[in-house]
Amino acid sequence: MTFRMILAFFTLCATSLFFGANQIEWSLLPTFNEKAWLPIIASRLPRLVALILTGSGLAMCGVILQHIVRNRFVEPGTTGSLDAAKLGILVSIVMLPSSDKLERMFFAVLFCFAAGLVYIAIIRKVKFSNTALVPVIGLMFGSVLSALAEFYAYQNNILQSMSGWLMGDFSKVVQEHYEIIFLILPITLLTYLYAHRFTVMGMGEDIASNLGISYAMTAALGLILVSITVAVTVVTVGAIHFVGLVIPNLVALKYGDHLKNTLPIVALGGASLLIFCDVISRVVLFPFEVPVGLTASAVGGVMFLAFLLKGAKA
């Protein structure tokens, strides 16, 4: 992990923390004036924490999925995970109208995990001559789930409730209304503890079995970790694309595939990218905000396209 990456991360954190539409009386901060500190403690600090956890969590989800499927072009957005989580939340709203975030997250995890199993079953069933078809199948699968979610929402007259999950938005993250996102912390720790198993799993089922690692159990664990992270993210801030696709590929290109060494870099890169996108979202139409999900899709898409073009020239 280079010094420049760490410096860039803390610079972005400081920018995110001290930049916003609400004016802060900077001269009163050293006196610990409650009114001056309120915007930072109640809104900007929770937002920054949510950005860091979401960015790092989604980037690590991308790594896990890429090792399970053994394809560089998959992430939660190209495997149907985000759409499955959205469908799960809608079902929870209809079945349990008074459900809280924890209950909605539980439904989202179940739907996410089930969608992951179905996607992997499809990938294992079909023989692909081109690896680019793997994410295409995922996008088609996600489109089916998204259509089901929209039909279900329309049927139950809750179509407007979907708007918050279609595009990630951190503007509503405030103190005492985002703490569920801290569940990503133990997920990150577990991912690192099982990094060696995920690395071996990425080499293939035969090699994993020869090295004494249960491919099925490791893949199931990976899907559970991904499902929880995606569910927590969608419930708290909404769906965010490309973070889990761009960062793992860039890190693997420069540092290799040994996850024990690269996971901290992946987490830092994911957090930095999402904070950068959030700052752009606040600057473009200041004092108004663009949803971070829209900015992340634009920035991530451009970065990944540049990555592909560079690889094609090489």
Swiss-Prot record:
Involved in the uptake of iron in complex with the siderophore anguibactin. Responsible for the translocation of ferric-anguibactin across the cytoplasmic membrane. One of its GO terms (molecular function) is transmembrane transporter activity. It comes from the Bacteria. The chain crosses the membrane at residues 1-21, 49-69, 76-96, 103-123, 132-152, 180-200, 207-226, 230-252, 265-285, 288-308. Its main location: membrane. It is a multi-pass membrane protein. Keywords: Cell inner membrane, Cell membrane, Ion transport, Iron, Iron transport, Membrane, Plasmid, Transmembrane, Transmembrane helix, Transport. It is found in: Cell inner membrane. Belongs to the binding-protein-dependent transport system permease family. FecCD subfamily. It holds the Pfam family FecCD. It comes from Vibrio anguillarum (strain ATCC 68554 / 775). One of its GO terms (cellular component) is plasma membrane. Part of an iron transport system composed of the outer membrane receptor FatA, the periplasmic binding protein FatB and the inner membrane proteins FatC and FatD. Disruption phenotype: Mutants cannot transport ferric-anguibactin and are unable to grow under iron-limiting conditions. This is Ferric-anguibactin transport system permease protein FatD. CDD domains: TM_ABC_iron-siderophores_like. Disulfide bonds: none annotated. GO terms for biological process: siderophore-dependent iron import into cell.
